[in-house]
């Protein structure tokens, strides 16, 4: 069971809504993933219409919606988008994204921290997408963010946990949930994130662009479950030396 702010989730896999070939395929994949928290970009939906092609099936599916501020380049733009989302969707939950460079889509640490502090004061449950910077993640936690969402690699790159060393520090020092977001390309990446101590992962591109998004979503669900179970089972420690699993000389001594 994963708890973030006032909500609990059975699934440790969060999903996105972008890049799917159709809304129907998107919903089928989300259901197959078992995800209970789904993020959506405000710029992709008509907030005035609950029968929007993306919004309506998500509401019908009964998932928790996590609007994001993707496309915002400054703290001010993100705060404005957050208030639009709260008014239209009736939720205080927000994935804070501020990335001014459209080529790399890397989060702006200064603007993100600035916006997070203001939004928390205004009553939002803020989950900030951020770089894998342990100092920044701690600062975001200190200003009241409900979780932190450091990247594994650039958005949509499918490179995996390229920031693993920093993620390990973030996880070790965090007192709020850590959700690895961005760059996760295959289910094994998700399993590794859970094994190393992450509380959840957010996956979008890897599922949406797969030849079979529904089966890929199932694969991610199983990988997250396996990674969490492995961590809870207490993996053995790594060693520089070999350690035999069977006696090496006993049978020789017995036959002598």
Swiss-Prot record:
Q: How does it assemble?
A: Homotetramer. Forms heterodimers with either ThiH or ThiS.
Instruction: Give the InterPro entries listed for this entry.
Output: Aldolase_TIM (IPR013785), Thiazole_synthase_ThiG (IPR033983), ThiG (IPR008867)
Source lineage: Bacteria, Pseudomonadati, Pseudomonadota, Gammaproteobacteria, Enterobacterales
Lineage: superkingdom: Bacteria
Annotated Gene3D superfamilies: Aldolase class I
Q: Which residues form a coiled coil?
A: none
Q: What is its main location?
A: cytoplasm
Keyword Cytoplasm attached: yes
**Binding of 1-deoxy-D-xylulose 5-phosphate: at which residues?**
156, 182-183, 204-205
Gene Ontology biological process terms from the UniProt entry: thiamine biosynthetic process; thiamine diphosphate biosynthetic process
What keywords is this UniProt entry annotated with? Cytoplasm, Schiff base, Thiamine biosynthesis, Transferase
From the Swiss-Prot or TrEMBL record, give the protein name. Answer: Thiazole synthase
GO MF annotation terms: thiazole synthase activity
